[in-house]
């Protein structure tokens, strides 16, 4: 059994762990939950090969590093060094290394430099060679909740691609779009995988479809604004994803029953959005029934809203799987409702 630690980005507490679980489940990677520290999520697994590590690294939006845990100790220098002394570094062979320490929210009193120097000395004394510029292996010591988690980094997540896909950088921009990092995390929570059929019934400029399409899903989007749909086509073509767009109302979709694997959507909040001849409440109730109808059994819907939708969703037939809230600004807290059919 191998312990794997995910060093999480700090933006929200629960969404990063939910997306990890979503990816592990969608990729059929066997695992059991080990523990959760602040910004660190640890699982136990029979083993992750390089291919699966690459999949995790390419899909996770809110993880920074993935670490194979070699040692765990209380977060004081003496215990950290004696933990490092017990670690088997023999797989380093003649490879060079660097040791990096990260204190979560700077809570601990020990300095990162002392941890790096202390563990580095253990390796140096055993004859291993450090390379501070271009090391073959990075060891990471993460100090969180009075615990130090130590081991080699098996993957680091490059978030620059998410930056490049920010709404303003896309060929077509229209206000009210989710950031690609969050869109990708929601796609992961929905357990989308390569080959899945993913629907966004309120697709707007196609932000969610782009993220699902980039992991190899076939995407389907509906909207009732022609100019926005034309913009979605421009964006989806730009990223060369597999898509179909429909000019149709989310409250009555020309789709057959059980035909999509996952739904991820960000319906209008009812402020400036176009809703088409009825109240937002009626639209939400109608479209939740439609989403339930077109989703395959055991399929998952991840829905972003400002107001609670649980009762309508349960009336439509859905089972609540999770609920996350995310404060956007003083007058807007997003609700992310995860619903299973
Ligand atoms: C919050 S935006 C979605 C933004 C989208 N995630 C994106 O990447 O651009 C909500 C979208 O719902 C659309 N909409 C409003 N009423 C609708 C309806 N009855 N059926 C389908 N789409 C509708 C709006 O035109 C708008 O594009």
Set out the residue ranges of the language-model regions:
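Class I S-adenosyl-L-methionine-dependent methyltransferase catalytic core
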Residues: 1-62, 77-86, 104-115, 125, ...
């Amino acid at each position: 059994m191998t312990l794997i630690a995910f060093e999480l980005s700090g933006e929200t507490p629960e969404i990063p762990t939910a997306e990890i679980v979503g990816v592990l489940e969608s990729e059929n990677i066997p695992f059991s939950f080990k523990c959760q520290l602040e910004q660190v999520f640890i699982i136990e697994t029979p083993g992750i090969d390089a291919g699966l590590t690459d999949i995790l690294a390419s899909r996770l939006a809110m993880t920074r590093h993935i670490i194979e845990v070699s040692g765990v100790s209380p977060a004081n220098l003496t215990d950290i060094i004696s933990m490092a002394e017990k670690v088997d570094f023999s797989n380093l062979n003649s490879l060079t290394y660097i040791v990096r320490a990260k204190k979560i929210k700077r809570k601990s009193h020990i300095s990162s430099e002392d941890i790096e120097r202390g563990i580095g000395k253990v390796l140096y004394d055993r004859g291993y060679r450090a390379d501070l510029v271009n090391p073959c292996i990075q060891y990471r010591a993460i100090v969180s909740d009075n615990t130090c988690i130590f081991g080699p980094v098996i993957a680091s997540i490059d978030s620059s691609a998410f930056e490049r896909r920010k709404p303003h950088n896309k060929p077509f921009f229209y206000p009210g779009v989710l950031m690609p990092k969050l869109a990708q995390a929601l796609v992961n929570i929905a357990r989308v995988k390569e080959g899945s059929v993913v629907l966004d019934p309120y697709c707007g400029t196609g932000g969610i479809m782009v993220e699902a399409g980039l992991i190899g899903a076939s995407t389907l989007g509906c909207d009732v604004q022609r100019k926005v749909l034309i913009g979605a086509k421009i964006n989806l073509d730009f990223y060369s994803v597999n898509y179909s767009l429909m000019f149709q109302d989310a409250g009555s979709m020309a789709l057959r029953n059980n035909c999509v694997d996952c739904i991820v959507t960000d319906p209008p909040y009812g402020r400036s959005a176009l809703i088409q001849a009825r109240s937002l409440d009626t639209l939400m109730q109608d479209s939740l029934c439609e989403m339930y109808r077109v989703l395959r059994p055991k399929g998952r819907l991840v829905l972003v809203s400002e107001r609670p939708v649980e009762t309508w969703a349960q009336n439509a037939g859905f089972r609540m799987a999770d609920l996350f809230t995310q404060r956007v600004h003083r007058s807007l807290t997003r609700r992310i409702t995860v619903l299973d059919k």
